[in-house]
């Protein structure tokens, strides 16, 4: 079970609000927040905006791809990829180049992932079933 605070932006305050809505980990957040109805229920129960919840749910979805954790999900988001279906549509070479460019400008991670890692992410994203509906 992955802790809520693994997602950028979910600090102790928001984690506490989510736990009050019976969301104890990222897997529960992804499961409950995968539908519009579930996100609305979460918004009502936690008092957290739907937009912010969706951002976190998309990041939790990216965590399903092996090798993408807190740091790389932030870098992917900064490079314009914030969902698994979006990752699946990307050309690995172009995405890798964009990630290097973004990281040089923003210094989000110590080491950018290798091209082979990005290729594996894109391939895995193509195989993963869609979980989040919009």
Task: Pin down the residues of each PLM region.
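C-terminal extensions
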Residues: 1-134
